[in-house]
């Protein structure tokens, strides 16, 4: 791995690098665990494992919302390494994120499942080929309700049959898939959260007990 720069506005050490894959070089984001800033409300484990957990769950559910992610050794120790996504700079990210597209709706559902507390506009990555990915999933899976997102346009809408099937699969695969990446208490909370989503049958609404939108939203 060859580190080429650092994103100075990131709250944790976030490095731009290239990794050799066969005879090719792939651009990646590298976040060493040693560079993670301690968080009072996420005291256990590390953010890198949570990022890996979101990737594994997204792939298992067939959503493909998270770029390829692994945890591996790098120049500054063990850390998360994620494929770099070239975004389409011509797109209006606010207009896209506030729209009704199925891809954005999938992201809103996924955030409700993983209890994402940091879905900002800047954490949504649209490409010129029409794909939409999400990044920065380190603050997810908390056992307490902490959903904060800019994707509230689907609040209270009923789940489709496809979305119910996604939730049912998430409930089935998550405990085995994510064991060791998040805490046992967080795994139990994840299953309970999915059960509640299935019981309600609709997208959650903003909580009165927790800020609904991350700040700043970009």
Where are these regions (language model features)?
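Conserved ATP-binding subdomain of kinase catalytic cores across diverse folds
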Residues: 1-117, 121-122, 128-135
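C-terminal catalytic region of ATP-dependent kinase domains
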Residues: 6, 20, 43, 127-218
